Amino acid sequence: MEKISLESPKTGSDLVLETLRDLGIDTIFGYPGGAVLPFYDAIYNFKGIRHILGRHEQGCLHEAEGYAKSTGKLGVAVVTSGPGATNAITGIADAMSDSVPLLVFTGQVARAGIGKDAFQEADIVGITMPITKYNYQVRETADIPRIITEAVHIATTGRPGPVVIDLPKDVSALETDFIYSPEVNLPSYQPTLEPNDMQIKKILKQLSKAKKPVLLAGGGISYAEAAAELNEFAERYQIPVVTSLLGQGTIATSHPLFLGMGGMHGSFAANIAMTEADFMISIGCRFDDRLTGNPKTFAKNAKVAHIDIDPAEIGKIISADIPVVGDAKKALQMLLAEPTVHNNTEKWIEKVTKDKNRVRSYDKKERVVQPQAVIERIGELTNGDAIVVTDVGQHQMWTAQYYPYQNERQLVTSGGLGTMGFGIPAAIGAKIANPDKEVILFVGDGGFQMTNQELAILNIYKVPIKVVMLNNHSLGMVRQWQESFYEGRTSESVFDTLPDFQLMAQAYGIKNYKFDNLETLAQDLEVITEDVPMLIEVDISRKEQVLPMVPAGKSNHEMLGVKFHA
């Protein structure tokens, strides 16, 4: 490696900050501690990077995730050694599951203390090995720029993901008068971006034969910023579109070709279309169990083309008749560049549209406050254009089902790991990244209590997110499963007492409202247009369930709770 002399000696922490700034990083989420004191001393007067002080390391990681998920930019977090690093594990695992580009600096004890059970030592490299795309432990100060440059490249290319850099305290404090050349030289890491041309032609050949094709759009469409190409392809060949949870927004919910989200809480039309399709083109989707139901019967009548940037995902769960490794945007561009093939889906479109229209969503005649109506009303008030963040649980599924999405990267949620507590910090990160966009958080009373300490950030950093709590006095999704599959034994899933969330909001200096009047609800919710941080608590019935529902292990057509128009 080439050595580059510096004009004056610099500490490792100086090199961290300067390298990040040179790579275009302008925001860091973090929490100080002993092992990262050299870093925090260096950032004290550093210009060009702002630091957002979280209130818990898990919160810092989810804030970085919200920042990254809503923009596609790299999210960066800094935590101290030992408990600081282990507190960050959930956020790292969440990012790995959902392919979120993160760079996480973990403090570490000085090199001489590593492996000797020093105070606040944890083997974070070993712990994070299965939940990172790659990880490093820096052993020499001069190597910091090279390692950071490589780490950013790895995190943001191919299938995005988290990279951890473990930084011993002495390495970050020591000065060096030279650095190793910060060039990316990774011959063993060469992600495939350009799909195979012959495989692209095979897709179109099969499409010309298909009578019942379906497009399955996953989160990879958003990550590749390929929504425009997806829509053009669907419209050219008149193919109905089903999305995964993370694929929401890649096609507008109002689009006539959109059938809804598929899977466990997917729409009737989407699940029936996947079951009856004779050709499925899956793009940027990993076929997780919440989408496929019983994999043995998933799309059982269909030839499957699977386009994914990660070759490890192809054939892992669902066998692909036409495997295509490559970037989703490039694949769609290549499909669109080929001569148009003849196909006729008129009868198929007529059938799936009929399926879509024959189902009624929920009983709007019920004389109670319904969560679906709350979400629909907020969709109206925000013109379907807000960045929508959710925590995890029933409210997450209702939000996926009933908010009128229009754009990619519009839904920020924890998909693969299903992390309760994700919502509040992720919404903060999304708003910091998108100060000119409306950011709405839907959260349950359970998830709210997991990371509510992050609300302290709202006034300090002027982050006007709108927190909409759907309060059913329970862990709603757990309770629903207990009622459905455990003979109604709601073991430890019902909150007999809850904190006064209104007083909690006041303690953090946040405007607060509580609504439970059905007659005035539509008007009451208009407060959401105010440009201030706020908590809107809406009491809903404990009996509400997320429907339809495919029981675990069942096939997607075996839905419970589907209601048809008379």
Give residue ranges: language-model regions:
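Active-site nucleophile and cofactor-binding loops and adjacent substrate-binding regions
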Residues: 31-33, 52-62, 77-84, 139-140, ...
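Conserved structured core elements
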Residues: 224, 271, 326-329, 368, ...
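Active-site diphosphate/adenylate-binding microenvironment
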Residues: 13-17, 21-26, 34, 39-43, ...
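A general structural motif
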Residues: 57, 116-117, 190-202, 262-266, ...
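N-terminal alpha/beta PP-like core and its mobile active-site loop of ThDP/TPP-dependent enzymes
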Residues: 2-341, 377, 381-384, 457, ...
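Phosphate/pyrophosphate-binding active-site segments
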Residues: 2-7, 142, 301-394, 518-526, ...
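Acidic active-site catalytic centers that drive phospho-/nucleotidyl reactions
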Residues: 57, 166, 308, 391, ...
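Thiamine diphosphate
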Residues: 119-120, 314-317, 323-325, 329-333, ...
